Each structure stands twice: as C-alpha cells, then as structure tokens.
Amino acid sequence: KGVFYKKCCYFLKHTINTKLARLNYNVKILIPYLINFSNQNQIAISGKPFVIYNSIDENKEISNISVCLPIKKRIFTSSGSDIICSELIGYTSVKTILNGDYSHRKTAWKKAKDFINKNRETEERAIPLLEVYNKSANDGLSPSKWQTTF
C-alpha cells in the first residue's frame, strides 16, 4: 500500500515472550483478555488490536511481543498489573496488507522490506514493527476473511 502516517495513540498492552510457532495462539488468547479488561473497567476502545514486536530471535524462534488495544484516554493501572498503558508516538511507515490467514505473514513482511529497498526508503530501527488485526478470528470470521496490516 505504500507509505502512510501512523497517528499517535494510547493503548493497553500485555507483554510476553513466545515461541514463534505459538505466536498466533497467544495473540488469540490475549486480545479477548485485553478487551475484557477494558470492558470491566469501562475503558473506551479506539481502534483494532495490534501486536508490537519488541524483539525477534529467528535463530531461537522466539519473540518478545506486546499484544495491544488502542484506547481513547491515558489510564494508570495498579502497580504489578500484567496490563499497562503506553503511548505510541506518531511516525511515517510502510503499510502492507495481508488478506487471509497468518501462514503468509513472512511474505507480507518481505513485501514491505522489498518496497523499502526499491523506493530507497529509510528503515528506522527505533520504530516498532506492528501487526494490526483489522479482521481476525476474534471477529468470528473464517481465515479467508482475515485482514492484517503490517
């Protein structure tokens, strides 16, 4: 899809270490967990859930991820809570859309990197890698209807 500007936002996050093979399973569990937390605490949701890749070790096949839910206002959680509020600062990025299940995730990431290289865009390592779940299993849809933005 090309270059776009990601607006800043506040979000709830739960951070875990996961094997890459279990990433989808963990995300599928944690998104409803965050939604339930926001509903129980009357926190207004302001967008679709997303994942931030804090680190990826492809050799060990593990990743540290934050499963996130955008919210309208900044909140403060109790000390020791497994859910915290953070802020995503706005930035310019390359946008790639994957239609279908996540088995094609690597191909989508490769297309984004190819776009960066082809168009001589600068890859800024300080900007987090995001996956936004526009339409997913949590919406009760079949895999062919899923849409993920990278």
Can you describe what each PLM-predicted range is?
Residues 1-150:
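A solvent-exposed interaction/effector surface
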